[in-house]
C-alpha cells in the first residue's frame, strides 16, 4: 500500500470508530434509561436490558479495535514509518484510544461498568473535536522527534493521562453522588457508593502517578538532553507538566500522611486533572513559544543549532 492509501485507510477507520462509539453510547443509554425510575435496590435487570448492556460493551470493543487500526494506518502513512504522535491530532487520537482501552481492561477488574456512559461520551466528543478542528495531513517528523525516547516518553505520558482521566471521573462522580444523598434514582443509583468511588479514584491515581513521574522527571529530560543538549529548558509544557506532577504528588501525600479522603481529596484530584488537561491542550493554543506546541502544523518541535 502507498502512504496515501494508508492515510485514507486511517481516516476511514477513524470514521468507523466514531460510528461504533456512537452506537455503543446509544445502547448504553437505552440500558440505563430502562432503569432510570428505580432506586438501585429495586432494580430487576430484564433480558432486554441486559442485551443492550452487552451490545454496548461489544460495540465499544469493536470501536477500540477500529481506533487501533486507525492509529496503525496513521503511522504507516508517514515516510519513513513512525509512531503516530507528531501533532495534536495524532496525540489526541492516541490519548482517546488509551482512555477507551483502559476502561475496557479495568471494567471488570475494578467494577467500572457504571463509568461506561461517561467514558464513551468523553471519547466520542474528543474524537469529533479531533477530526473537525485538529485534523492534519500526515507529515514527516523533525529531527528531534526521531528518537526511541520519544516512544518511551509519550507512551508513559499517554498511559498516565488515561489513568488520571478515569480517576478524575471517579472524583467528579464522588462529589455529585455525595451531594445527592440520600435517595437516588436513575444513573446515580447505579453508581457505587461514595466510599467506593473514593477508593477506586485513589487506586487509579496510585497507578498513574509513578508512570507520570517516569515520563516527566526521567524520560522527558533524557530526551530533551539528547535533542537540545539540555535536560531542562523552561519550556511552558515542561513547566506545566511539573506543576501537574506537584499537584498529584500533593494529592497522594495528603491522602497517605494527613488522611485526606472524600470531598477534600476529590477537589484536589479535580484541580490536578485541570492542570493535566491544560498542559495537554491549553499550552498548545496559549503559548506560541513552546517547543512542544502541536496547535497547528506537524511536529512543531524544532531542533537547536
Predicted regions and their residues:
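Polytopic transmembrane helical bundles with strong interfacial aromatic enrichment
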Residues: 1-305
Amino acid at each position: 500500500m502507498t502512504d496515501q492509501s494508508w492515510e485514507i485507510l486511517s481516516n476511514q477507520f477513524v470514521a468507523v470508530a466514531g460510528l461504533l462509539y456512537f452506537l455503543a453510547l446509544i445502547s448504553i443509554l437505552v440500558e440505563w434509561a430502562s432503569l432510570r425510575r428505580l432506586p438501585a435496590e429495586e432494580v430487576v435487570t430484564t433480558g432486554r436490558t441486559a442485551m443492550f448492556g452487552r451490545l454496548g460493551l461489544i460495540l465499544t470493543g469493536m470501536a477500540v479495535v477500529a481506533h487501533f487500526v486507525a492509529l496503525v494506518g496513521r503511522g504507516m502513512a508517514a515516510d519513513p514509518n513512525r509512531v503516530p504522535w507528531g501533532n495534536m491530532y495524532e496525540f489526541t487520537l492516541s490519548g482517546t484510544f488509551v482512555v477507551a482501552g483502559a476502561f475496557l481492561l479495568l471494567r471488570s477488574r475494578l467494577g467500572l461498568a457504571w463509568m461506561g456512559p461517561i467514558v464513551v461520551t468523553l471519547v466520542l466528543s474528543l474524537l469529533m473535536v479531533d477530526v473537525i478542528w485538529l485534523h492534519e495531513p500526515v507529515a514527516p517528523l523533525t529531527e528531534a522527534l526521531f528518537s526511541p525516547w520519544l516512544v518511551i516518553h509519550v507512551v508513559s505520558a499517554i498511559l498516565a493521562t488515561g489513568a488520571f482521566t478515569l480517576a478524575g471521573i471517579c472524583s467528579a462522580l464522588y462529589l455529585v453522588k455525595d451531594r445527592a444523598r440520600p435517595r437516588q434514582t436513575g444513573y446515580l443509583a447505579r453508581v457505587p457508593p461514595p466510599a467506593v468511588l473514593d477508593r477506586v479514584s485513589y487506586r487509579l491515581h496510585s497507578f498513574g502517578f509513578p508512570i507520570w513521574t517516569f515520563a516527566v522527571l526521567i524520560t522527558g529530560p533524557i530526551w530533551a538532553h539528547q535533542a537540545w543538549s539540555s535536560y531542562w529548558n523552561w519550556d511552558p509544557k515542561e513547566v506545566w507538566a511539573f506543576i501537574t506532577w506537584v499537584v498529584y504528588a500533593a494529592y497522594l501525600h495528603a491522602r497517605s500522611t494527613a488522611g485526606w479522603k472524600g470531598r477534600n481529596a476529590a477537589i484536589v484530584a479535580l484541580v490536578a486533572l485541570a492542570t493535566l488537561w491544560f498542559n495537554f491542550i491549553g499550552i498548545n493554543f496559549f503559548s506560541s513559544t513552546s517547543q512542544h506546541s502541536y496547535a497547528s502544523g506537524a511536529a512543531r518541535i524544532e531542533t537547536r543549532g
